UniProtKB/Swiss-Prot annotation:
Protein task: Essential component of the COP9 signalosome complex (CSN), a complex involved in various cellular and developmental processes. The CSN complex is an essential regulator of the ubiquitin (Ubl) conjugation pathway by mediating the deneddylation of the cullin subunits of the SCF-type E3 ligase complexes, leading to decrease the Ubl ligase activity of SCF. The CSN complex plays an essential role in embryogenesis and oogenesis and is required to regulate microtubule stability in the early embryo.
Ranges for region Disordered: 1-54, 268-294, 535-581
The family this protein is said to belong to: Belongs to the CSN1 family.
UniProt cross-references to InterPro entries, sorted A to Z: PCI_dom (IPR000717), Rpn7/CSN1 (IPR019585), Rpn7_N (IPR045135), WH_DNA-bd_sf (IPR036390)
Gene Ontology biological process terms in this record: cell cycle switching; oogenesis; regulation of oogenesis
One GO cellular component term noted in the UniProt record for this chain: nucleus
Keyword Nucleus: yes
Keywords: Cytoplasm, Developmental protein, Differentiation, Nucleus, Oogenesis, Signalosome
Coiled-coil segments: none
UniProt lineage: Eukaryota, Metazoa, Ecdysozoa, Nematoda, Chromadorea
Entry protein name: COP9 signalosome complex subunit 1
UniProt biased composition (Low complexity): 14-24
């Protein structure tokens, strides 16, 4: 039987198929055997340019966008509004976060496509050595500028010139740098020094990321980077890199595994750090090592981040990555719960998601899943959400309109912010579903107090046309959220009461029987009290146990009144008539009279 390779659930490396090749030597920097002529997989113009210019390595042009290019494959979307300012986007995000968002806009917004490509070209040239995307984006920009529809359009950026010198220099140095880093990594690995091996792996990983080689970076980290992390800060850096590269590669399965394992490890480290700090913070004795105000030297070097700060930053990023994952899986209730756990002050300001993004994701998810009472309590009245939405006054107004039943204004704001949300790569696929859920909840909330309502009045109140309202009502009927009839001739909507009449009558009869029984019981008690009849339960007639004699004696004190025993040995309160304890020792004729009275009742 052939041995099967199984994945270790605690291992953050690649799947078993990739781990099996971990012992194989790294491929050479040139990547492709020159004797084999590969089939061009990228742009033919890029291939021809690489053949004409030997300074550009063939492997940099052959495979174009790696996994980042497939992040929105199969997603058909076109936004024909200029809903985002590309310049402000570059200020709000950096590195791979800006790359993903600008690339998504270039694919799905024809109006902003040229501006997005120009920003991407400038970013790649200034901050990376990614020749592949640089050349590809230039070709796409030239194709966009050559279109007839583009002639009357104005650009917000100056069109750059293709820097052939930069392409040749980076193409020539990339191969030698890769060979050098690979040789250094192999040498340290053979020597068995963990710290040196980890540094070599980190250098090679960053080199691949700078060149846009996501697959190579993942394959390198899958060779067991976790085994070489000897300090807490090394492990934290590893988790953050794993999460970022998984998001860039659009590998949501890997992101799920990494975030779950990272969260457990970081929480354990956080608990250990808290216990360590508490043990070290013992109060000093009076007069011994008492802290006084000390003037700080302005020339002294700034202290690096403590382990606690590193852990909190990593936890914030881990939870933010889980928000993206749960949003992708449409678990909207968990999105709200996770956002409330994030310490936004510890989250990097220009990461894949900002505090404002988290506020938008959480607010829309809450509106789509929570009742209005819970929404007011957990979102409107929550300081965390108010802080997240400080820079989004329009969305704050949307939330207020929804909770105050101003549905017309609510739908108006939703229509105005929809294009901007559609150009967000992390929530774009959820916008239509979230808005539909919110719209249905608004319609149901409006119908609740009515049994009959005019469609024209309702359409005006919710800010929809009669046709749109009718379609929305039909969807609610099909999903069995409401039972109603639409009279198109009179333009009236009638709400049907599906409650069973027999069940209602049965409940009424049960209630009446209970009330009658209670009234009879009161009359019986009144008659018994008028006849001076005292009812004794079985519990009171049971013989007392030996250990209860003393307690029983004290129970006969009647709240402090002295009890005297008569000659017959029967205890009775002094000064009270024996009629107080009369039971059924009266004359039989009187008993018959009492029973007849009770029978009449």
């Amino acid at each position: 039987m052939q041995n099967e390779l199984l994945d270790d659930p605690m291992d953050t490396g690649a799947p078993a198929a990739e781990a099996a090749a971990a012992d194989e030597p790294l491929p050479p920097a040139h990547g492709i055997d020159r004797e084999v002529t590969p089939k061009p997989a990228g742009n033919p113009d890029l291939m021809q340019q690489s053949l004409d210019n030997p300074a550009i390595p063939m492997h940099l042009i052959e495979k174009r966008d790696d996994r980042r290019e497939s992040c929105d494959d199969g997603y058909s979307l076109t936004v024909n509004e200029s809903a985002i300012d590309i310049e402000s986007l570059a200020c709000s995000y950096d590195s791979n976060a800006f790359f993903l968002r600008a690339r998504f806009i270039a694919r799905h917004c024809p109006i902003l496509r040229a501006d997005a490509y120009i920003s991407l070209i400038n970013y790649l040239k200034e901050h990376t050595t990614d020749i592949t995307h640089y050349v590809a984006f230039f070709n796409e920009l030239e194709s966009e500028l050559a279109r007839k529809e583009f002639k009357n359009r104005q650009l917000n950026f100056q069109i750059p010139l293709r820097d052939q010198k930069w392409i040749e220099e980076n193409g020539a140095t990339w191969q030698s740098t890769t060979d050098q880093l690979q040789a250094e990594y192999k040498r340290h690995k053979d020597e068995g020094v963990k710290e040196s091996t980890r540094r070599a792996m980190e250098d090679l990983f960053q080199h691949y990321m700078m060149a846009g080689k996501i697959d190579e970076a993942i394959r390198l980290y899958s060779r067991g980077i976790r085994d070489y992390c000897t300090q807490l800060k090394h492990s934290i850096n590893m988790w953050i890199n794993w999460m970022e590269v998984a998001i860039c590669a659009n590998d949501w399965g890997k992101l799920d595994t990494v975030t779950n394992t990272a969260y457990r490890s970081l929480k354990d480290a956080d608990d250990a750090e808290k216990n360590s700090q508490q043990s070290q913070q013992a109060p000093p004795q009076r007069g011994e090592n008492a802290p006084y105000m000390v003037e700080r030297d302005p020339n002294a070097p700034i202290q690096t981040l403590t382990n606690r700060q590193l852990i909190e930053t990593a936890l914030a990023k881990c939870l933010a990555a889980q928000v993206l994952l749960k949003l992708r899986n449409k678990r909207y209730s968990q999105v709200v719960e996770t956002i409330l756990q994030i310490k936004t002050e510890c989250l990097q300001s220009k990461w894949f998601v900002t505090s404002s993004d988290l506020g938008i994701y959480g607010m829309l998810s809450a509106m789509a899943t929570m009742s209005r009472a819970d929404l007011k309590l957990q979102v409107s009245g929550n300081g965390t959400f108010r802080k997240l939405l400080e820079s989004e006054p329009q969305l704050i107004e949307l939330l207020g309109s929804y909770t105050s039943s101003r549905f017309g204004r609510c739908f108006e704001i939703m229509r105005s912010v929809k294009p901007r949300l559609l150009l967000d790569p992390f929530i774009s696929r959820n916008v239509d579903e979230l808005f539909e859920k919110i719209r249905q909840k608004c319609v149901l909330q409006y119908l609740q107090p009515y049994s009959t309502i005019k469609m024209a009045t309702m359409a005006e109140a919710v800010g929809m046309s009669s046709a749109e309202l009718q379609l929305s009502l039909l969807e609610l009927i099909e999903q069995k959220h409401v039972s109603l009839k639409i009279d198109q001739n009179e333009g009236i909507v009638r709400i049907l009461d599906e409650r069973d009449e027999n069940a209602i009558l049965k409940r009424v009869n049960v209630t009446c029987d209970r009330a009658t029984q209670k009234a009879k019981s009161l009359l019986w008690k009144t008659t018994l009290a008028g006849a001076n009849i005292h009812s004794i339960s079985d519990k009171e007639t049971r013989p007392k146990r030996k250990n209860q004699k003393e307690s029983a004696k004290f129970d006969r004190n009647f709240g402090g009144i002295d009890v005297d025993e008569d000659p017959r040995g029967i205890a009775g309160p002094s000064g009270l008539s024996d009629d107080f304890n009369i039971a059924y020792d009266q004359q039989p004729q009187q008993q018959v009279q009492y029973l007849e009275d009770l029978g009449d009742i």
